[in-house]
Amino acid sequence: MTRTAAPPATSCRRTRRCGAVLAGLTLALAAAAFDAPAAELFQSDGWDLRWDNTLRYTAAFRLFPYSNAVVADPNADDGDRNFAPGLISDRLDLLSEFDLSNGPFGIEASGAFWYDTVYHQANSNDSPATFNPYTVPHNRFTHATEILDGQDADLLNLFAYGSLDAGDIPVSFRVGRHTLLWGESLFFANNGIGAGQAPIDAIKAASEPEAEAKELFLPVDQVSLTVQPSPDLSFAFYDQFEWRRDRLPGSGSYFSDADYLDAGGERIIVSPGEYLYRTPDNRPPASGQFGAAMHLMLGEVDYGLYALQFHAKEPQILTYYSSSGGNNDGAYWLTFPSYIQAYGASFSTYAGESTLAGEISLRTNMPLVSQGLFALPGSGGGGYGGFAYAALRPPQVSPAPALQAVLAYPTGGTLHAQLSSVSTLSPGAFWQGADLSAEIATNDLLNVTGHPELLASGRDSFAAAFRAVFEPHYYEVLPALDLSLPVGLGYDLIGKSSVDASMNNGAGDIELGISATYRTVWQGSLTYTHFIGPPDRQPFSDRDFVSISVQRTF
């Protein structure tokens, strides 16, 4: 099944100016349109112009102070120390969407703007000695983090679309910035076939653990094409001409547990007074990312086959270290592995009121969890998301083009599988309707083909994780008011993955919430998130929080 993901807000400096113009225009007109429903601005002679806006306010509160066990690593403590119990987010979001169409052809554009007051003021950091940035005082956020988490605008979708007949064969296309999600991933965005097609909003994944994969993927510039020679057979293709990295939490932000990644990351603490300073990243080429898929409907089952090549969106860390002493002992930089291949198959079908789906995929040249050639104090040889430290000693501090071909992280073949179900439950004694979604995901390390000496010790070849969301609904509780009570559970069942360092058995999270919809355009929610697991497996084990949000669509 091919899904077009709903694009979440993300920072993108290259498109900030366009997003700012769009946000400014929307804010200027929002007051006049606020009492109107979703706007169909124009319709005449086949032309249809729509403009839809969603304005949301969110406040989130930390419940408990940091744990000394969690902040023991000086390179993973700033995000924890920066926030005392109390307000951790005071944020306004605006999403604006335009669609101009004429028959089967059209142009779609969307943009986002956000502002969070928390990142524009002093924080609660109480440890200057373990504060990684050097451009700001220990109780301030770096400028890059302030922008990413505190105030930004982004152009999301901007593409032309259309459909036509090539003879008797229907053909549809999209050209421009949009998102594709192939395969059948429900929750585990990074484990599925579609993981190679787009970067992931890791901030949203951490702050909303129950979010579905389609809500986490970010758009990129590409051309995509679907050809359907018969009602039961279709082929899909895409070619990307933009590479974007995952949107990792800014250094020192609430959901950051790596002080050296990504926006705002400035240095690694080796020992008191000794540092590795960040130098420019090694970015992969914009080209070389493409894929093809086939779907065949046999009876009630949709089968899919996939092949794609992509560049990694999450980084590995390379370092240059000198033991000569002094205050500038070396450097580190982020590198993004290139030319990873994936081959997969999927199925989806219906069983009564439920959808059952699954997929399996093989990746080659896949970067693995790195052990590193040296361990920093308190790190145990690990790092944020498993982006451990692989030491490399180049002839100069700044990475030269010739060094990009040097493998300083382990790679290998991996096998990934996922099975999911989405069910609509009939009215019962305790609800008027309910939805139940669940997925299990596994990954298996088949072989190590590059730098096996760098593979992290203590990791397992096989790992499995589970996530489920149950949401009962109650209609017309008051006139025009509907309520639901979502409950989510995520838990890593087996193994410490050698493929995904965030998959550690015994770690997980629980979400308890209540959400309301009034007159279909007002929505509100209250959610409590509790993180499960010890600090060595769950870096957010002391960061339980409550969030409140209200939004209006107009």
Enumerate the predicted regions with their spans:
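Short loop/turn motifs that connect adjacent beta-strands in outer-membrane beta-barrel proteins
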Residues: 37-51, 64-66, 98-107, 120, ...
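Residues that define the transmembrane beta-barrel architecture of outer-membrane proteins
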Residues: 47, 75-77, 88-94, 151-156, ...
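Transmembrane beta-strands of outer-membrane beta-barrel proteins
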Residues: 49-57, 107-111, 171-173, 235-237, ...
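Residues on the lipid-exposed face of transmembrane beta-strands in outer-membrane beta-barrel proteins
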Residues: 53, 94-100, 109, 157-162, ...
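Transmembrane beta-strands of outer-membrane beta-barrel pores
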Residues: 57-63, 113-117, 177-181, 239-245, ...
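Solvent-exposed loop segments that connect transmembrane elements
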Residues: 65-81, 120-144, 193-208, 249-278, ...
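Outer membrane beta-barrel
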Residues: 101-259, 465, 488, 494, ...
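Outer-membrane beta-barrel "beta-signal"
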Residues: 521, 541-554
